[in-house]
């Protein structure tokens, strides 16, 4: 377990905060760490910023993540990792497709040749929108409060997909499943970063299993070819207790 110090806590939206800290560790875009919150347990978090000054961006959706968002400069941050394979970052034009907080793990890929499709339920839940110039971003909201009125996969169909060398996707699994349907069969290189229930992060507990693949060890990044035909992707998710729940994907 590594003990670091929080340098800064920046509020991104009503329930999302970015925590900055110094850590001299090489990390690939798309890798993650297991963050330990004393008294609350561990949760997996992707890195939203690399370099010597690193960051994680946290959405408060449960007691552990909510406690993380409350950390202040000087507070302890406990983690282990980094884990996972990370993205295969290609040269040339790239498109990031982030749903909800999914743009967080994609952001370290961004360079001067990168566009971003960012989607959320409503304007107030958009994250990192202002980190991309208007000419390089596509915005979609479910309620139409900002940008395109609709879902990420619907807006993606209006974009010239073939103009990109690579497309990287992260978000809720239902959203990614629909994006996969739009992208399969295209010649562009595509990778998805999956978000699944994780307890150990090192391939022991098997709670993150996806059709025989361990997301924490073999992922969390998968090429589109690995997900096409996977019997669980977009079909089931597993709760922390191990219960399988069918996803509502139409």
Swiss-Prot record:
It comes from the Archaea. One of its GO terms (molecular function) is oxidoreductase activity. Pathway: Pyrimidine metabolism; UMP biosynthesis via de novo pathway; orotate from (S)-dihydroorotate (NAD(+) route): step 1/1. One of its GO terms (biological process) is 'de novo' UMP biosynthetic process. Residues 1-89 form the FAD-binding FR-type domain. Its cofactor is [2Fe-2S] cluster; FAD. Binds 1 [2Fe-2S] cluster per subunit. Transmembrane segments: none annotated. [2Fe-2S] cluster binds at residues 200, 205, 208, 216. Keywords: 2Fe-2S, Electron transport, FAD, Flavoprotein, Iron, Iron-sulfur, Metal-binding, Pyrimidine biosynthesis, Transport. Responsible for channeling the electrons from the oxidation of dihydroorotate from the FMN redox center in the PyrD type B subunit to the ultimate electron acceptor NAD(+). Heterotetramer of 2 PyrK and 2 PyrD type B subunits. PANTHER family: DIHYDROOROTATE DEHYDROGENASE B (NAD(+)), ELECTRON TRANSFER SUBUNIT, DIHYDROOROTATE DEHYDROGENASE B (NAD(+)), ELECTRON TRANSFER SUBUNIT-RELATED. Belongs to the PyrK family. This is Probable dihydroorotate dehydrogenase B (NAD(+)), electron transfer subunit. It comes from Thermoplasma volcanium (strain ATCC 51530 / DSM 4299 / JCM 9571 / NBRC 15438 / GSS1).
